[in-house]
Amino acid sequence: DSYINQSATFHSDRTNLNIKRGKCDFSFFNISIGHKLSLSLQNLITNPFNYMAFTNNIMIVRHRLLTELVKLWKNGELTTDKIDRLPLELSPRRSKHAGRCCVHKERAVWKYKSLPLLGLDMDDETDELTPLSEYAARAIERANNGKPKDNIMCVIDEACSACVQINYEITDLCRGCTARSCQYNCPKGAVHVHADTGKAWIDHDTCISCGICHKSCPYHAIVYIPVPCEESCPVKAISKDEHGIEHIDENKCIYCGKCMNACPFGAIFEISQTFDVLQRIRKGEQVVAIVAPSILGQFSTTIEQVYGAFRQIGFTDIIEVAQGAMSTVEHEAHELIEKLEEGQKFMTTSCCPSYIELVNKYIPDMKKYVSGTGSPMYYAARIAKEKYPDAKIVFVGPCVAKKSEVADQKIEGNADYVLTYSEIRAIMKAKDVELEACPNDNQTASTFGKRFANSGGVTAAVLESLKESDNCIDAKVCRANGSQECKKAL
């Protein structure tokens, strides 16, 4: 289950093809931003929301809340006082409220966490007295009359715990040793020793968080305390305001979603488009799902049954993004040969919108080396619109960053909405769709197109396409998983 841009990592000998053409030395980069997703039995937690893998309780809580909201929508109660009572039902009187001061705070957190799931953000808040039903009515009105919000992510200030900005702390494990390596190696004299106990302490007004004391202590008594969301952000796009609440700088953010995955209090949300899609279905419009190949690893039933479940949700048709991937392969293979013949020394893939954001915002000199070919989502959307000219196209995948690609006004003919797998599963559960009972819905696509979800899959498909067209080259492939590897490689 993924709320972030993740690249499921599988290893295949097919990604290490040696293709030769004269003496040409060409480097081809396969780029994806995010975490490598390692699925194992230890990571799969049996829970009431079967078929999905959750990595922590935050995802379960988020999934539960969205499921309850969709149930209210299904029953026509989303804009009634039933939704106003939802926080009370989720946190009843005298219930445990771990990490919060009281049950009333917990209820406020439930309320404000509902806003991004409804497709709103904190800028849409009026005040604390505005009922959730009014926000839900606004969300439905916007879904009926307009486009989804352009901003991709937001911080729920009520849920943010305002983590203390102290990076190093000396614990009770300090033995008060004679060496005092921490004190004598501190470049700012920020480490002091208590006269009575001999134990060290840090003056945080002087400390510059260099970590030398941490490395110097032979007892490992000095610990590093991160601010998880800030620590996880590869481009430092999230920081505290004057009230200690985190804020995301949209001008810096690359929408990788790592901060959302890292926050232990679940205070960072993507702006969901769930109700935008559901309203289109309810109004009887044609709504076509284009599904990423990584869906093969998301459910325990057959993929044909999963597609059958999509039909029961109300989708007009299901088209595999792997079909669009083959258009990406063909165009990118031709582009590769053209740039090679023009004397360019390397080219990177362009399927990951987080990577594109990274290059545009932080390494603009590398833009000319990024492939200009459209992503598989783009070509799959074009296939869908050729078949259903009046339909709304919904990309279904694991990636938050795809919402930034959809919101990009410079890309015409792309998908209209994006749903994550967890959002799809919440809809299934709320609408009582049982996967095992769903009829099969067959789809076919190229094996190489489906391997786009693998690490190195894009490169392998492009090189295989060149091989089949007799345009063989001696290609040196460089993989980069995650933004740090991307920056290092470039």
Regions flagged by a language model, labelled:
Residues 3, 10, 26-29, 49-51:
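Aromatic (phenylalanine/tyrosine) cluster motif
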Residues 11-16, 23:
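Intrinsic low-complexity, disordered N-terminal segments enriched in polar/charged/small residues
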Residues 3-6, 11, 35, 42:
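Low-complexity, intrinsically disordered or signal/transmembrane-proximal segments
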Residues 35, 40-125, 131-132, 270-490:
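Iron-sulfur-associated redox domains of electron-transfer enzymes in respiratory
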Residues 164-257, 261, 266-273, 280-285, ...:
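Glycine- and small hydrophobic-enriched segments that form the cores of compact globular domains
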Residues 47-216, 220-227, 489:
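Ferredoxin-type iron-sulfur electron-transfer modules and their immediate structural context
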Residues 14, 26-28, 40:
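Compositionally biased, low-complexity intrinsically disordered regions
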